């Protein structure tokens, strides 16, 4: 029996709640199925528009869940519902969901009817949090898939295509958890769970020595040798390697302990350094039970190397107050030993080694999500014709990406930290004196008196006139961003107000934990999950800072990082319970609700200004909070530079278009901090290469610990480096019409600025795994150089387009790898044939010459178009239609460039503008100063056609 219900025939049933069949109940916008068997007792599927569904599965009968923190949309749309051959089908205009009556499994088809997402195993496991019952949840899809998978936030292990990878989503200084995936099959999957979540293998990795057997000298366990200097202090057998957290340091052998002393703020380890050299060597034979690719995760800080059968497989350094995971894989055969050796210079650091056995190939290559704490399996399917449409659909669920003010896309100068207002202002004055473009200066932490963290006040000796400081910066056409934390010392008036209302977390205070400042001070964070707490927090911030005229808000440590190097269990204890429930249930969502409170406050307090927030962490929906994200306290290492490419691209593909990184890396090895002569050349080259990458990132921001990062400081005495940095800065400003347009498109077209090659070239499978290049808007292919001394690099040019070398004008056919020239002062950069790239005048800040001339660079070889965007740059009036577009279209066949009639307008818009057109043909290099012009005219808003000479 086939049953099909149209909307007219459903009206009475909707009113009466009549079941459509014994196993199926029609509800507004969808159905609830009670399967015959399986883990889920009830499965609800609801439509969210014309291409999205929500699936909720529970092992009991209750489907009433709290309102999602991530999703702001409501169920909408009326699918055509049919029951046939044991399936209930919900058909929308652009997507179809099918539910099996036998076990409640759901599968999804695209607009053409092609199966793209198919549930496999589903599991619920009883668990608890704060003594209350909850569920650990697990859902697998698409076993044995060959699709490309992207998104999931920002991760630091050079993972681009997640197919076959394992990723833990748990907020951390450098790791951002956003449980949203986008697939080459043109669907997205939003996993609506706020707790710690895993993609891939749901089983946590085990210490090497627990699951994977290890032996040495005929005995179980590792041979561990502890050295003080060159002297062997302790040799012992250890079952596994685990110095991951502060609590684990108690296991350090007494005879191998070294004296520690405090280190300078800018040194390798602000928690202290050891006196003399300290090292540990672990060696052992590991014997696997399974044949296949074994995965390892080394959690480490300081210098560490890993060798397998004598071959180095990993070499990393990371600052000790911010250790993190480093992944590697080894092909291993069951029963065949592999000799592992780990060499570590701990310097009072942290280290642990974990392992995961190979999964069956259909499981390794699947979409598999699991969460520690929840109430149900709850996820959203989002369909589309391409990845851009999928990301747009995700934003339709979780909120549009707010436009940033135009000055946010200029250059940002920062350092850790300006100690006085005179230091900050002197930097701005020097940039202006040298005519180096800049728009933003940043006041990092510790502008307050030492014992007053959370007062949002200024140390009067160092910052005697913060209002005057802001005013002078403004007079120099520069905005000021200031650091504001969710952290409080309990003695401050702000903390006392929050405490009186019950809005401070108590765990850190009960533990009497002290921070690293001065003698150390007890501290904690506020609880943003209560609306009243968010209102108090913003009012305190407004009265102390917003009213002084600061322009942008650096929301640091928003994971929250209440105390570094605590275990997950300790972190949960310190960050809860929240006003909405156990901390374990809300582990990943703090940065979202915190940013929402600040953004809402800013919109109310300053209704004529677009807010700008820079936050270290984010969650699903953070793009709606006027927030840009950055990649945390990464290190000044070539491998970290390389890691930022895939980190930024995947965050962008998670629906967050505004992203940045600390140019040069935040934390430094002592060889750089001390400017050791043997390493100065590498330090400078690293910063220059990173600066080149930064100029083609969504936000262009220099920041880090000593040495000073200002262009005129870091390049002092190196004329070629200085000139290259200034040239890239000026190029960024020349490109501002292009950059601001692609930035505006993130709102108006739900676009993405920093694009994985796979987004534009999904049919070219070679693009799927490229983790060292990306597209910056539709025109530019950016290929950062990430190795010291490299003067060429291989660049894959995607099939389906021609590519101009930006430096030489040589036109390459796509679908090939070219060896691009990469002198120290230049980064390989390519432009897609058919691109139209608008550039502007030579300016020193974005507000200069709002009516300045435009050059339209037309890269011939294919037809193309560009919609040049303008608005007032600072207000939210763009949301009311106050903006202008100039459509530009290039027809390769006729050789005609059509500049269309201006569409729209806004207050202060230039009515006329000088426009030049330059056509590029193979072999013609892009003119760096943009002075040369083929044809020039005055554009008054009327359409005009220009023909190629």
List each model region and its residues.
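A low-complexity, Ser/Thr/Gly/Pro-enriched, surface-exposed linker/loop concept
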Residues: 23-24, 28, 46-90, 127-129
